[in-house]
Amino acid sequence: MAHARDPTGAEIARFIATRTGAQMVQLMRCIKEPAAQAAFTAKLLVVPPAVSGRPATPEKARKALNAFVGFRCYYVTIPMFKSWPMKKLSNLIGLLWEADPNKSLWSLMAKAWSTIRDQIGKDQAPLDQFFRIICPHLKLPDPASYLEIHGWILTVNEEGDPTISRSADSEFVSIGTGNTDVALSVEDIITYVQSLGYAHGFILDDNKPSSTFLGQSVSSTLEKNTSAISVTQATPNAAHARFLVRNKRRAKRQAVRNASYRASLDQDILIAHQFNPAPVDEHMPDCHSNTAPVLDQCHNPSPNQFYDGITTLLSDQIPTGQGDAGHLDNAHLFNDYSLPGDVSFITIDDFTTNMPNLIDYDAFRLGADEDVALPIFDDITHI
């Protein structure tokens, strides 16, 4: 049988440290002697805070430093900018950033500093000190000479605000990363700044591959300068040449469209008049006028059979003395204007006609005999 023993001081301290507020109040009530209460209260003052059983909430990942923000933090110290507040310099620094040729380097430096900050904190990794160490190593222009190297001119407008413009004859190049072929990574930047005493508390994981890597082939400054100038001069000429070639292609396509429209219109006109179509590429002369018939002037083409048939049909109904001379004098002709329109021609005495194929259609008159024999249409094929 185990014997009861008194708890040690460490066990008592651990027991008290793990009690809740309600349990501590209950313990105070159980102590009756004033001296014991005073001793217990003094003990509570030196007890460490209670440890919660809940897991600690993981710290939210910080947002990586933006490359433009890093560029602005470094070049806002340009000596010529000291006369104006930051709100008047924001637009100028934005213009400098848009034309800066080393954006890839600034992105790599921002990634390296963000990696250091996330591990040891911002207080242990000052941003301005980081740029003062790494920018000269990468041969980036210092703030005092940046405007001059890149051909920027600072002026003051009528309102007293600063403005910048680039001189037309300036010869600026992408300056940075030395004069040799380089391959740069985030780890390379961190290793270099640590070698100069920056961020001693940062521990680099050698087993983790680099997530950001910059490969860049850089020739001599003279070769870069010559290449930049030649590209700058060749760009307007090449753009102008492309513009001329494009306009020439458009003019050629438009000429083909116009020719096809004219040929199609000429073809439609010929088909409408039932002429023999002329060749597509042959120009159709405007030979007719407003005073002369078209058929008489356009080389006298063959008459239209459709119009001739209509003319013959209408002219046959006109009474002519020469055509009716063979009939009796007292005979009533079919095309005689004196005949009433509501009288059957067949029932008229001495009816005669100069139309041999006339068919009696009296059976179709209103009130006609239903039993009358209908005429046979010989020109219709019976099925």
UniProtKB/Swiss-Prot annotation:
Species source reads Cochliobolus heterostrophus (Southern corn leaf blight fungus)
Q: What is this protein called?
A: Mating-type protein MAT-1
Q: What is its main location?
A: nucleus
Where, subcellularly, is it found? Nucleus
Q: Explain the purpose of this protein.
A: Mating type proteins are sequence specific DNA-binding proteins that act as master switches in fungal differentiation by controlling gene expression in a cell type-specific fashion. Transcriptional activator that induces the transcription of alpha-specific genes.
Q: What residue ranges does this record give for the DNA-binding region? A: 60-117
* GO MF term set: DNA binding, bending
GO BP terms in the entry:
positive regulation of mating-type specific transcription, DNA-templated; single fertilization
**Which domain of life does the protein's organism represent?**
Eukaryota
User: GO cellular component terms?
Assistant: nucleus
What keywords are assigned to this protein?
Answer: DNA-binding, Fertilization, Nucleus, Transcription, Transcription regulation
Q: Which PROSITE patterns does the protein's record reference?
A: ALPHA_BOX (PS51325)
Which gene carries the instructions for this protein? MAT1
Q: What family does the database annotate?
A: Belongs to the MATALPHA1 family.
